Regions:
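Catalytic centers of hydrolytic enzymes
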Residues: 1-164
Length: 164
């Protein structure tokens, strides 16, 4: 799953979470989209997002990925990136020469997939997607929380590292 930081408008306090709080944190109603992105498109999106470190007015800010781990400098440079599989195994990605042919399946929202904030080319308009779903990430988040039926621990898992 990929999103940009500007889609998140708050945080969860410790304690019970209800759907109203989910909708406050992620208030934008965007349908989920499944598509394939090349390694190069992923690297380019993270590089563009990292530029917000040198220009605070630069939208969209950093990219928040699931399945990717990366290091950026406060000068806006992408230093390292790797793909992390479901078992936690990391595979390095060459950020200086990413593959234009190696593809990753990504779930994101239609704003991001449509080139919103200029991080990606418009994959929706060009019909370069696998599926557009008739629900948004708020519903997915609520469904996930309900399915857990137990407290959820939110912790820093080290996916994004910022260095001087």
């Amino acid at each position: 799953f990929n999103t940009n930081i500007n889609n998140i408008r708050g945080f969860f306090e410790a304690g019970p979470v209800d759907s109203r709080q989910v909708f406050e944190v992620v208030p934008l109603k965007n349908n989920m989209v499944k598509l394939k992105l090349s390694e190069k498109e992923l690297v380019d999106a993270v590089k563009k997002g990292a530029k917000s470190f040198i220009d605070s007015g630069n939208k969209p800010g950093i990219v928040i990925p699931s399945g990717l781990k990366y290091t950026v400098s406060r000068q806006g440079e992408l230093k390292a990136m790797s793909f992390v599989d479901k078992n936690g195994k990391e595979t390095p990605i060459d950020v200086n020469n990413p593959s234009a042919t190696k593809l990753y399946t990504v779930a994101t929202d239609d704003f991001f997939a449509s080139g919103g904030d200029n991080l990606l080319p418009n994959k929706v308009q060009s019909k370069e997607y696998d599926e557009i779903f008739d629900f948004d990430k708020d519903k997915l988040t609520c469904d996930y929380i309900k399915k857990q039926n137990a407290p959820i621990e939110i912790k820093d898992d080290g996916r994004i590292t910022i260095v001087d």
